[in-house]
Amino acid sequence: MSEDAVKNAILIAGPTASGKSALAIRMAKATGGFIVNTDSMQVYGVLDLLTARPSRADLAEAEHFLYGHVPPSSTYSTGKWFEDVEALLGRCELQGRVPIFVGGTGLYFRALLGGLSQTPEVSAQVRDHWRGRMEAEGAKALHAVLCVRDPAIAAALQPSDSQRIVRALEVLESTGKSLLEWQKVKGRALVDDQSAQKIVLRPDRAWLGERIARRFSAMWAEGAIDEVRALLALDLDPALPAMKAIGVREVSAFLAETMSREEAIERSVIATRQYAKRQSTWFRNQLGEDWRVYASGEEVFQGGSFRDPQ
């Protein structure tokens, strides 16, 4: 543990649509704390609705940081998020207050508690080489290359995950070592693992599935089409993370008149449910036993299980 690691933090993890944001606001009001985004998609601008960022009403109830601060034309890494959190925690006006980290990105929580893996920088020449090959040959072809050169990490990556495939190849060529080996070398933590309150929401699967369907229908009604239209107007590289947000492809197909409204909503709901399942599986398998599991945010406050860390 780093000597300057925050000792009064609250961490709230869980799948999308599980009620994390409402719980974070309630805790912020109870503790006088502030909320820090711990979700890799909610950092991007433009997609307020599709990434389920806090509403204007939510923002009025508690201070929120690191939401929508990254242009969708950028690629934002776990390392950059770590740097932004470190700078945020160092701000004088926030000293002594409770930081409440809330989101669904497991790697962000891992970075907070275990420190960020010390992966190396790669040269521009190596980066340009592999990104050029990715553009020319595609993700599946480079995944096949990775299967030969580094089968262990290739097995852990989806053949369509172009960003991580390129990163693995870059690191291997630059250092002669697998990215998996570099990931074992940990840096410092920003949050003290022992004193942090660690909460993971694990709602009933049927309840979550229904909530996801209702929420996406509401997103559509509230302006998700306009968000995607604005995103497409930027003429961005389809490989950028913001372009891969759930709902972007489906709404784009609707706008192009190649998919009906009903099918676009149905496919988006299915994709969101699948994503929630992957998140739940990751949290179940990767988080330590000291994370307290609750079915809902309301349950956290029942029976006196919540304690003010101040």
Curated annotation (Swiss-Prot):
Binding positions (ATP): G14, P15, T16, A17, S18, G19, K20, S21
EC number(s) from the headed UniProt entry: 2.5.1.75
Binding site for substrate: T16, A17, S18, G19, K20, S21
Pfam families: IPPT
Catalytic activity: adenosine(37) in tRNA + dimethylallyl diphosphate = N(6)-dimethylallyladenosine(37) in tRNA + diphosphate
One Gene Ontology biological process: tRNA modification
Enzyme class: transferase
Record site: Interaction with substrate tRNA: T105, R127
Physiological role: Catalyzes the transfer of a dimethylallyl group onto the adenine at position 37 in tRNAs that read codons beginning with uridine, leading to the formation of N6-(dimethylallyl)adenosine (i(6)A).
Family assignment from sequence similarity: Belongs to the IPP transferase family.
Complexes and interactors: Monomer.
Protein name, entry field: tRNA dimethylallyltransferase
Lineage summary: Bacteria, Pseudomonadati, Pseudomonadota, Alphaproteobacteria, Hyphomicrobiales
